[in-house]
């Protein structure tokens, strides 16, 4: 049978459920599909289907993730849900499932727990822009006062991690009762989705951002000049435009004298295109893999940053032994390995850590030996002798 065509008539937003184990993330995800399916906006997926998510590999790291899609009146959503806590950590850090916003699921019976906090911190560190709270299992709490207290606690917690705790919508739901078809709880799922529609902003499309292309390869074409090839990460570029070459050495400006794709000339290259840019007055030696071509002034190179890092377990092909501050691995940034040093670590509770074990999720400070174009929210890998031993995301630029 012919495959269904993906209709692009509604804006597309990526979201996911986050929160403590057993607070009902997967049940809520199933409830959203069952309620929306009644309006023809989703395909029903039950708990077992979502929970039995297949393993995926992202940069050599095994992650279990369920992908569910549905739509509301105004939007099309791709929703990710992970069975295990470690899967969330890996997912959010590697950006395997990029989230434009998240539904934080918290059980009214328990209130915020350890992983509730950890997921809020992760969301902050990896740059999830907006959250909506689903206060789940509200059918099991008769006392309105308890619910109010839990809501206050969640708001305080969100504010302590620099989310707008007072303004984030908290919707009282019961995933289980909604799946069982109880009308009042089905209506609550609709209310939750209205809150998601209203509070999670539509992501800026890649093509509207300033131009950036990481250089993968460089050729010189006799009589025409030097061509840098790569995939345009964002924005667009036209023949005749001025661009800047940033990273590794001093930044310099040049003009694009041609855009080529599959050996044909293009008027302009767009985000997602693999293409070659012909650069005026640039020798092959002036440019190398790891540099980026950008809209002038839109990005500056840096050497020092903070990152949230997941260190691979030995079963995932990571190290077998711990490492300490002063450790010098390679940081694989966009298209190249750059040597650097990890100067300090901090645990989730903010305490200093002397030693990092395989399987840990930590905040670290890294320093590179040469400046490269790094920016907040950017993903990187930590490698040693060509194998990946960690995955990270830049949470803050220091210098």
Swiss-Prot record:
Residues that bind Mg(2+), according to the entry? 26
Gene Ontology MF annotations: GTP binding; GTPase activity; translation elongation factor activity
Compartment(s) where it occurs, according to its Swiss-Prot or TrEMBL record:
Cytoplasm
Provide the residue positions that the database annotates as binding GTP.
Answer: 19-26, 81-85, 136-139
Reactions this protein catalyses: GTP + H2O = GDP + phosphate + H(+)
What keywords appear on the UniProt entry? Answer: Cytoplasm, Elongation factor, GTP-binding, Hydrolase, Magnesium, Metal-binding, Nucleotide-binding, Protein biosynthesis
Recorded GO CC terms? cytosol
In residue numbers, the region (G5) covers 174-176
Q: What class of enzyme is it?
A: hydrolase
Keyword Protein biosynthesis carried by entry: yes
**SUPFAM superfamilies listed in its UniProt record:** EF-Tu/eEF-1alpha/eIF2-gamma C-terminal domain (SSF50465), P-loop containing nucleoside triphosphate hydrolases (SSF52540), Translation proteins (SSF50447)
Coiled-coil region: none
The annotated region (G1) lies at 19-26
G4: annotated span: 136-139
Note the NCBIfam families from the entry. Answer: EF-Tu, PRK00049.1, PRK12735.1, PRK12736.1, small_GTP
The entry's family comment says: Belongs to the TRAFAC class translation factor GTPase superfamily. Classic translation factor GTPase family. EF-Tu/EF-1A subfamily.
HAMAP family linked:
EF_Tu_B
Q: What does this protein do?
A: GTP hydrolase that promotes the GTP-dependent binding of aminoacyl-tRNA to the A-site of ribosomes during protein biosynthesis.
Quaternary data: Monomer.
The protein in question is named Elongation factor Tu
Q: Which gene holds the coding sequence for this protein?
A: tuf
